[in-house]
Amino acid sequence: MTNMLPVLSVMGIEACPIPTMLLSTHTGGYGKPAVARISPEYIKGCADHYCEQNVKFDMIFIGYLGNEELAESVLYFVSCFPEAMVVFDPIMGDHGKYYSNFDASYGEALKKLIPCADLLLPNLTESCLLAGYPYAKELSRKDLKKICETLHDLGAKQLIITSVPDGRSEKSILLFEQGMMTMLETTQLSAEFHGTGDAFDGVLIASILKGCSLKESMIEAHRFVYACMEESLKMKYEEREGLMIEKNLYMLV
């Protein structure tokens, strides 16, 4: 959230953040963080309050939940605002497995949210876990098409899948739109900064809200994230400190 909010603000998007879990740090590189859990009742209460006050949303972005018990309350929240576009990043794993604090039951809980997603934003690992497809570091176009079609059948209207090896560059970004796959070839940098996905998502959804196509939006998101990674490496920033976005926010104005 700390990477997304500045991005949205700079791009002229007013955000209304609703926390699902509060952590003293992210879950990688700082040991066990202090955690404050948000109750399902709070999420539902927010929805009821906004409805009472006639608050409207152009888009609802669903990101890190951290607790499978929140899935039903998130569905309730979405149902209260049927005119909003729903974008869902099912944050739960990478490198072929669940993050250490999640398991298959968490994945099943997140599956319940797929039907409400106008746009689903998993990485390759998350797309395999949700589709029930064996993960591999190299997947053919046929494999990727099957994964996309499975997620589409589960209810996702459109997909953008990140961290996809395609045999020509180390990681690409896949767009699945109207039954067609488009690959954006990217160059991989030798670092994995925390918060990269949040920055990518922020630029992506802001670009969509400003009227850009999905392809244009993901190109702009990648351009910004790549520049931030270059700056972070240049400054010899620790990966656990997260992606350094501040010096590149001007790119989004």
Stretches with model-predicted labels:
Residues 59-62, 87-95, 121-130, 161, ...:
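Short beta-strands and strand-loop turn motifs
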Residues 215-253:
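Charged C-terminal helix
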Residues 1-100, 246-252:
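Conserved N-terminal subdomain of the carbohydrate kinase-like
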Residues 101-181, 191:
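Conserved phosphate/ATP/ADP-binding segment of small-molecule kinases
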Residues 21-23, 66, 92-94, 126, ...:
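Glycine-rich beta-alpha junction loops
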Residues 129, 191-214, 218:
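Short, small-residue alpha-helix embedded
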